[in-house]
Amino acid sequence: MTTMSAPRIAGVATAGYGLAVALRPGVLLGPCGWSDDNTAGRAVARMAGMRDLASGLAMAVAARPNTMRLAIAIRVGSDLSDAVVLGRALRGRPQRAKAIAATVGWGLLCAATIAATRTG
């Protein structure tokens, strides 16, 4: 694996998921137990999908280690904010633990790839 391969792979995966959510909001809404019949819910899911697409692409194409670290930090911050927002929105619902685990887990996975950006 070449330098920065791990964050690039994580970036491509993130971008792919983001595109899937942007095109089909139910990919995000369904596991949360929300219907995708709601126009506002679909719009919010699409916004999150587009954000994930953009941040994933930033990780996939970052040319320098500092740029990659910034892209990773943005991705991790997005995942952690998703954990907070979904945790609050799903309070008292069975989907809450899974949503928090998925968002925090993905954030930690992306954070772990930062080691690949270290030189020397």
Model-predicted regions and their roles:
Residues 1-120:
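Short amphipathic, positively biased membrane-proximal segments
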